[in-house]
Amino acid sequence: MVCIPCIVIPVLLWVYKKFLEPIVYPFISPIINRIWPRKAVQSASTSAKKEESNGTCKASGTSITNGSVSRGEEAVPDKKTD
């Protein structure tokens, strides 16, 4: 069974978001703007943007490639013959 708060809390949040917030928000908004008047923090470093790429990873010479830590050729074991 699902506990009662697990059902009641999401329903109450939905009711608030759907019906109460449009009524209450215009009254609360000026108060919130006085408390938090600052804008969002902007990223100041442009070097971070230069380091970003299109999702490819630039591997260095010491990185692990394809899950293999060893260097050079690996010995491939022969198949078992009966």
UniProtKB/Swiss-Prot annotation:
Q: Where is this region: Necessary for its localzation to the endoplasmic reticulum and lipid droplets?
A: 1-37
Entry's family note: Belongs to the UPF0729 family.
Q: Keywords for this entry?
A: Endoplasmic reticulum, Lipid droplet
Pfam families reported for this sequence: DUF4512
Chief location bin: endoplasmic reticulum
Record's compositionally biased regions (Basic and acidic residues)? 71-82
- Looking at the record's lineage, which domain of life comes first? Eukaryota
- Where does the record locate the signal sequence feature? none
Q: Quick one: where's region Disordered? A: 46-82
Annotated protein name in UniProt:
UPF0729 protein C18orf32 homolog
Polar residues bias spans: 54-69
Where is this gene product found?
Endoplasmic reticulum; Lipid droplet
- Cellular component, GO annotation: endoplasmic reticulum; lipid droplet
